[in-house]
């Protein structure tokens, strides 16, 4: 065990994490030259394309150090994005060390900070590496200073490297051997293994990526998953060098995979503890939590005949994405579809994109909404994830909405516009600090304001320079109301929305005006109203199409004209009582993709 080193790489998007991993694998001869492809560890096409890492991957590398000994280095690649922060914390708790990769030309960014704090809390040794030193605009001294100011770790001996040219790779490996502690653990104790990640393989079922904390695991052992209580027979264990290589056993301190013929990914939860069914460990490893979706949206097939196909596609995605939740939902407007829960906005975009790309689906997505806690008058608490499920106004005692803590980094010339944006989104400033040219802002903002378009607006007011990271803080009482849309006095469930009371009139006005342009004119007047409970707060009319009944009267008596007009009016009134208004699909899309102008 003295020769094992487990480490991961923390970095912001595009700071060169995956390229660095490629170089380390190449230097240790993990893959033959012909098998190297850029970003070896990012196995999904969408990961390569967006340049992000979604699932954790590992590589077990053999490194011959300068002291002549051979070390087993286990590289655990972590996702860097905020939506996957739970996966990050699991990956980090399986390591003793982490490389903090900072782009020497850009300095520290928001996500790096969040993940780095997670690492420090978990007691992981953090080794700073300044990457992209081959760029002419690289400024190592400023970057060093920023790491010390913002994160507060000593960066005087940070390794200068360039993953692209291969400079500094040997130094990084030597630093890992010298500074990352060897794993602690007892190979003779009861088996405890932490599930870092799990995914579904078409041939063998669920593959679990684990870090063995104590004990030894061999094939043919009967294993118990502590959170779900399921038992399975372990069929195969091994390591990835990124290719999978079977082994006869995995012992304490090692990182590898277990295949046990599990059919459902839901049984192998990330962060769960694996132990032997025969002699189980006394307690599971700490830190396991069920991943709860934060953002909900409806997904509907454009063609209602594709409903079954959409369900199959979602089920296939769920095999590899335990955090995705979905349940069937029917809407008057869009037909049959699903209410899906996601970890955050990026997760939602990725699911949509994978549905479109891998399964060739055409889908309509409704505007994302968040989960509210509604306390009713009788004391019961209801969890509401869609406007249609909000109880009636009279029954509600209190509504609580999720608040997130947002960390923002930006060059100081953009502080003004970014602060204005946060204040418009009902944000409360908690902290602000200057680090060289960078400014670090902390805000508490309701999640509902962030899911709509906060990220896009942030990028546009800061010309793309601001970076953000958010984490869930708590539920807080809020004055939010459900705004219903009525067409000729009938509620349309699909168009209801939950908004803050202060913005309600403004949003209602906006939506009603937009609807007026989208509903085609009928033979009778159509009233479009927005209401909170019974109080109408905005109204527009779509005027009726009418025939000119007076065309045949030349001159003549006024009473004759009046009679014809009265007759027309009575006819229209009768039509209005029996006629129904067809709402075109475009009208729904216009509302659901509502922008705060």
From Swiss-Prot:
**Topological category with respect to the lipid bilayer:** Peripheral membrane protein
Q: Which reaction does it catalyse?
A: GTP + H2O = GDP + phosphate + H(+)
Give GO terms for biological process: positive regulation of translation
| A Pfam family it matches | GTP_EFTU_D2
The family this protein is said to belong to: Belongs to the TRAFAC class translation factor GTPase superfamily. Classic translation factor GTPase family. LepA subfamily.
Q: What does this protein do?
A: Required for accurate and efficient protein synthesis under certain stress conditions. May act as a fidelity factor of the translation reaction, by catalyzing a one-codon backward translocation of tRNAs on improperly translocated ribosomes. Back-translocation proceeds from a post-translocation (POST) complex to a pre-translocation (PRE) complex, thus giving elongation factor G a second chance to translocate the tRNAs correctly. Binds to ribosomes in a GTP-dependent manner.
**Descriptive protein name:** Elongation factor 4
């Amino acid at each position: 065990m003295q020769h094992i080193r487990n480490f991961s790489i923390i970095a912001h998007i595009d700071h060169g994490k995956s390229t660095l991993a490629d170089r380390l694998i190449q230097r240790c001869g993990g893959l033959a030259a012909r098998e190297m492809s850029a970003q070896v560890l990012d196995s999904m096409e969408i990961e390569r394309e967006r340049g992000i890492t979604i699932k954790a991957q590992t590589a077990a590398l053999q490194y011959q150090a300068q002291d002549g000994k051979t070390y087993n280095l286990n590289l655990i690649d972590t996702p860097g994005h905020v939506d996957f922060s739970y996966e990050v914390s699991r990956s980090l708790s399986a390591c003793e060390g982490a490389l903090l990769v900072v782009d020497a030309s850009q300095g520290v960014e928001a996500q790096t900070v969040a993940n780095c704090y997670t690492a420090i809390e978990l007691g992981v040794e953090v080794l700073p590496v300044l990457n992209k030193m081959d760029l002419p605009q690289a400024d190592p001294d400023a970057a060093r200073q920023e790491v010390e100011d913002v994160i507060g770790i000593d960066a005087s001996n940070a390794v200068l490297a360039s993953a692209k040219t291969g400079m500094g790779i040997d130094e990084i490996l030597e630093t890992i051997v010298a500074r990352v502690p060897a794993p602690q653990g007892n190979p003779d104790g009861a088996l405890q293994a932490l599930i870092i990640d799990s995914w579904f393989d078409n041939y063998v079922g669920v593959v679990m990526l684990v870090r063995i904390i104590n004990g030894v695991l061999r094939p043919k052992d009967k294993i118990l998953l502590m959170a779900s209580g399921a038992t399975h027979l372990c069929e195969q264990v091994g390591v990835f060098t990124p290719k999978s290589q079977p082994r006869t056993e995995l012992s304490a301190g090692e990182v590898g995979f277990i295949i046990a013929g599990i059919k459902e990914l839901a049984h192998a939860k990330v962060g769960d503890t694996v132990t032997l069914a025969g002699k189980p460990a006394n307690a599971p490893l700490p830190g396991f939590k069920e991943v709860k979706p934060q953002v909900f949206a409806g997904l509907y097939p454009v063609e209602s005949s594709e409903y079954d196909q959409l369900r199959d596609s979602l089920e296939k995605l769920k095999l590899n994405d335990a955090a995705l939740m979905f349940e069937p939902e029917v809407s008057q407007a869009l037909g049959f579809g699903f209410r899906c829960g996601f970890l955050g906005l990026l997760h939602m975009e990725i699911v949509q994109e994978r549905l479109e790309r891998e399964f060739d689906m055409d889908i309509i997505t409704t505007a994302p909404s968040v989960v509210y806690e509604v306390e009713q008058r009788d004391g019961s608490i209801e969890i509401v994830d869609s406007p249609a499920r909000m109880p009636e106004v009279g029954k509600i005692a209190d509504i609580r909405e999720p608040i997130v803590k947002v960390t923002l980094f930006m060059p100081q010339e953009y502080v003004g516009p970014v602060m204005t944006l946060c204040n418009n989104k009902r944000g409360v400033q908690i902290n602000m600090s200057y680090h060289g040219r960078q400014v670090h802002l902390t805000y508490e903002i309701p999640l509902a304001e962030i899911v709509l378009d906060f990220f896009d607006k942030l990028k546009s007011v800061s010309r793309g320079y601001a970076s953000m990271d958010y984490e869930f803080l708590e539920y807080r009482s809020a004055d939010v109301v459900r705004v219903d849309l009525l067409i000729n006095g009938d509620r349309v469930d699909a168009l209801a929305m939950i908004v803050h009371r202060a913005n309600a009139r403004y949003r209602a006005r906006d939506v009603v005006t937009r609807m007026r342009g989208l509903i085609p004119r009928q033979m009778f007047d159509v009233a479009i109203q927005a209401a909170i409970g019974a109080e109408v707060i905005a109204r527009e009319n779509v005027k009726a199409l009418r025939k000119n009944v007076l065309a045949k009267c030349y001159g003549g008596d006024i009473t004759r004209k009046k009679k014809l007009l009265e007759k027309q009016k009575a006819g229209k009134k009768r039509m209005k009582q029996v006629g129904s208004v067809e709402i075109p699909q475009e009208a729904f899309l216009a509302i659901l993709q509502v922008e705060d102008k």
